[in-house]
Amino acid sequence: ADAQLEVLANVTEDQLPLLDEYLSAAEIAVSKSPLRCPFDIQVRVFAGGDTAFVQIVGSHTNVVRIEKNGEVLLNKPFSEEAAQPPESRRSLTVEDIIAFADEVDLDDVRAPIARQIEYNTAIAEAGLTGQYGAAIGKILLDSYGDSVQNRAKAWAAAGSDARMNGCEKPVVINSGSGNQGMTASLPVIVYARELKASEEQLYRALVVSNLVTIHLKTGIGSLSAYCGATSAGAGAGAGVCYLYGGRYDEIAHTVVNALAINSGMLCDGAKASCAAKIASAVEAGLLGMQMYRHDSQFYGGDGIVVKGVENTIRAVSSIARDGMRETDNEIIRLMIGEETVK
C-alpha cells in the first residue's frame, strides 16, 4: 500500500519471463464488483495454504482493506461523499483560471511546469522514435504532414503510444492520469515553439491548460465511462488559445466548442487506442479554438451545450458522472466476458 503507483517498480527484466509463465498457468477469475462506486477493485489471492485480500476504492491508491489468512490488517471506511474533491477545486471557474494565469508569480509554479515540459516532451520523443503500440503519433506525421496542428496531435498521441505500451519514462500527470497530463501539455508546447513564445508565455499557457483540464475533470470524478482525454484536449485548446492572445471570451468559447464536438467519446480502459483518442481530443480542442477565431460557435440549445461556459461544463459533468454509469457497467460486462455481442 505504501508503494502506491510504484508497486511494480522493482520488477526486473529477469523476472518478466516468470510473470509470463505465471499468467499462463494461474487460474484467474474476473467478475464485476457489486458496489455502485465506479471505482472498486477487490483482489483475493491464494498461495499454498495462505490467502490475502486487498480492496481499493474511489481512487487508484486508496487502499481501504487488507486481509491475510482472514486477519484484518487494515480496514478504512470509505464513502463517495468523503471522496469529493476539495472546495478549492470545486470552486474553480474558467474566468478565475485565466486571471490566475495572468498574475501568478512564475516561481510558484516553475518547478512542476518545468518537469512537465521536460518529462512529457521526452516520452513523446520516445514514442516518435521507438516502436510502441499502434504508433499513432508516427502515422499522423507520415500521413498528414508537418503542420503545427498535426504536430500538436502527433506529439500528444506519441506520448500515449509510449506510455500505454511499456515505456518506463516518467510523465507529469493531470487529474491522476499520465495521458491527460500529456494531452493537456504537449500541444501547448508544440504551439509555443511554432509561435516562438517566450518561456513566460509558455508557462502561463500551461497553467491555463492544466487548470482548465482539472476544472473539467473535477465534476466528473476520478473514473467514468467518459474519456478523460476529452477534458484534456479542451484544456490544450484553451492553452493554445492563450498563446494566441485569447483571454476569457475566446477561451470560454474554445472550451464550449470542444466539449460540444467530442463529449461522446468512451473510456474503455488504458491501452493502445488511447493514443488515437488523444489525437481526436486535441483536434476537437484546436477546432474549437479555430471556430471562434473565424466568428463561429455553438450556442446554448445545440445539443448538450448550455448558455455559459460553466453551465456547459456542469452539464457535461452530469452526463459523464451520472448519465454514463450504466454505460460503464455495460463496458465492464463486455470486457470481462459476462456479456457477448449479438
Q: Can you annotate each of these PLM segments?
A:
Residues 20-166, 333, 337-342:
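Signature of multi-pass transmembrane helix bundles
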Residues 198-220, 225-243, 249-251:
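Helix-loop-helix junctions within the multi-pass membrane cores of secondary transporters/permeases
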Residues 162-173, 213-223, 267-271:
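Glycine/charged-rich beta-loop-alpha catalytic/anionic-binding loops adjacent to active sites
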Residues 147-166, 198-216, 256-264:
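Acidic-glycine-rich active-site phosphate/pyrophosphate-binding loop
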Residues 3-10, 17-18, 37, 45, ...:
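Functionally critical mobile loop/hinge segments
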Residues 1, 181-198, 237-245:
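Alpha-helical support elements that line or immediately flank enzyme active sites
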Residues 3-46, 194-200, 206, 210-213:
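Contiguous domain-boundary segments centered on the initiation and propagation of an alpha-helix
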Residues 1, 169-186, 227-231:
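Conserved phosphate/anionic-ligand binding catalytic regions in large, soluble enzymes, centered on
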